[in-house]
Design a protein with these regions (language model features):
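Short loop/turn motifs at secondary-structure junctions and domain boundaries
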Residues: 29-30, 46-50, 173
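Short helix-to-loop capping/linker segments positioned immediately adjacent to catalytic or ligand/cofactor-binding
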Residues: 119-123, 142-152, 170-174
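Cyclic nucleotide-binding regulatory domains
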Residues: 19, 44-106
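Phosphate-/nucleic-acid-contacting segments
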Residues: 168-215
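Short amphipathic alpha-helical elements of helix-turn-helix/winged-helix folds
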Residues: 162-166
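Cyclic-nucleotide recognition modules
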Residues: 27-28, 79-141
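Cyclic nucleotide-binding regulatory module and flanking cytosolic helices
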Residues: 1-42, 86, 91-93
Length: 215
């Protein structure tokens, strides 16, 4: 009899192996032995700032926000994670403690791999190293774009960019074209680098003007 948890682990390893392909059967067995799957309720932390990064994570189900606190006591959402995206590994490769925090935006399931195990596989399999090199490069490019948008665009432009980012990453519901991610007004303001009151007012203006998200 195969336990449900074992089945989930095998399915996750299979999905990860497809992204890192080609992997040998021995490498897949290493991942299967190392993987740990954990469920998180909405608003629960996956990791906190100043924690020691010892595990690499991939989101299996749900949505997660990565954010950082500023000097003014306001949080800034760096990005939102969707299923089958990796996170929580940059600090390890930079030999740093976590500078950000990760919290579940809704009930979520996360798979964990020990970073030492992944690094060992990276040394043995060039395709895994190349995957993360491309992954980090893509994130860096997106971060550059976000920096320009948040520092040079006006309030309406910043909020519009945030809404388009969410739609492109998470999609929208077919019946009414609403976003397939539910953010609080505070989180949307944080993603757009503005106060909550400005976000509410700008959203109201968008609604009154009957504006729609289209990428």
């Amino acid at each position: 009899m195969v336990l449900k948890r074992d089945y989930e682990k095998k399915e996750v390893v299979k999905a990860v192996a497809e992204m890192w392909a080609p992997l040998t059967q021995a490498e897949k067995r290493v991942l299967l032995q190392d993987i740990h799957i954990k469920s998180f309720k909405k608003n629960h932390f996956i990791y906190k700032s100043s924690d020691l990064p010892t595990r690499m994570m991939v989101l299996i189900q749900g949505k997660i926000k990565i954010y950082k606190w500023g000097r003014n006591g306001r949080s800034q959402i760096i990005r939102a994670i969707k299923p089958m995206e990796f996170f929580g590994f940059r600090a390890y490769f930079a030999n740093e403690l976590y500078k950000t925090e990760a919290m579940a935006l809704e009930n979520a399931v996360v798979a964990f791999f020990n970073t030492d195990t992944i690094v060992k596989l990276m040394k043995e399999n060039f395709h895994i190293s190349l995957f993360f090199l491309r992954y980090l490069s893509k994130e860096l490019g997106q971060s550059d774009d976000r920096t320009v948008n948040l520092t040079q665009k006006h309030i309406r432009g910043r909020l519009a960019e945030a809404l388009l980012l969410l739609k492109n990453n998470f999609g929208s519901e077919e019946e009414d074209d609403t976003l397939s991610i539910h953010l609080s007004r505070e989180d949307l303001a944080s993603l757009s680098n503005m106060t909550t009151s400005n976000a509410i007012r700008t959203l109201s203006n968008f609604a009154n003007e009957n504006l729609r998200c289209s990428s």
